[in-house]
Amino acid sequence: MTIKSDRWISRMAAEKGMIEPFQPGQVRADENGEKLISYGVSSYGYDVRCADEFKVFTNIHSATVDPKAFDERSFVDVKGEYCIIPPNSFALARTVEYFRIPRNVLTICLGKSTYARCGIIVNVTPLEPEWEGHVTLEFSNTTTLPAKIYAHEGVAQMLFFESDEVCETSYMDRGGKYQGQRGVTLPRA
C-alpha cells in the first residue's frame, strides 16, 4: 500500500468527487483574519471539518450502553458553532465533507494534534473501499473539565492508502450498513 499525495487527492476530488466540498489548500483563518483550526488538503492527507450537528452523550435515563440495542435517548442533540462535551464523556458529530472512496483505496482517520494536546481524542474507523457518506466522528473528552469542539473547523486528518491489488469484495458489494450515511449516524446492529 502506498500513501497518496496532495496531487492525487486533489485529482481524485476533481475527477471522481472523492471529497465534496473540497478545499484545495490549507485554510488557517476565516474571511475576517480570525485564526481557525486548519482544514483542507495537506501534503499527504486531507484535514476534515466538523459540521454544526452534534449528539452529546448523557446518562439521564440510566441506560446501559449496548451497541446491539443502542438507546437513542442517551444523546442530547446540539446544533451550533461549537459543542461543549462534559468531562469524561463523548459526543458524535459528522464531517462537512462527503466522501466517495475508490475501490482500491483504504482511508485512515487520525485526530489533529491541536485537539489531542487538549485531551480530546477523535475516533473514526477506516473508510473502506467503495464506502461513501458523511463520516461520523466520535470525540472523547478524557479530561476532568468540559471540552469545546468547533464546527466548520479542522478536527481530523484523512490519510489515503492505495492498494497494489483491487479488493475482491468492497464495502458497497457487502451492502455495508453505513453506506451512503448522511448526518450523524448512531450505531446499527
UniProtKB/Swiss-Prot annotation:
Record: active site: 138
Record key words, sorted: Hydrolase, Nucleotide metabolism, Nucleotide-binding
Keyword Chaperone on entry: no
Binding site for dCTP: 112-117, 136-138, 157, 171, 181
The protein's enzyme class: hydrolase
E.C. designation(s): 3.5.4.13
Entry GO MF terms: dCTP deaminase activity; nucleotide binding
Pathway(s) of this molecule: Pyrimidine metabolism; dUMP biosynthesis; dUMP from dCTP (dUTP route): step 1/2
Any one Gene Ontology BP term: dUMP biosynthetic process
Catalytic reaction annotation: dCTP + H2O + H(+) = dUTP + NH4(+)
Subunit structure: Homotrimer.
Entries under NCBIfam families matching the protein: dCTP_deam
Family: Belongs to the dCTP deaminase family.
Function: Catalyzes the deamination of dCTP to dUTP.
Name listed for the protein in its UniProt record: dCTP deaminase
The organism's taxonomic lineage, starting at the top: Bacteria, Pseudomonadati, Pseudomonadota, Gammaproteobacteria, Oceanospirillales
Underlying gene: dcd
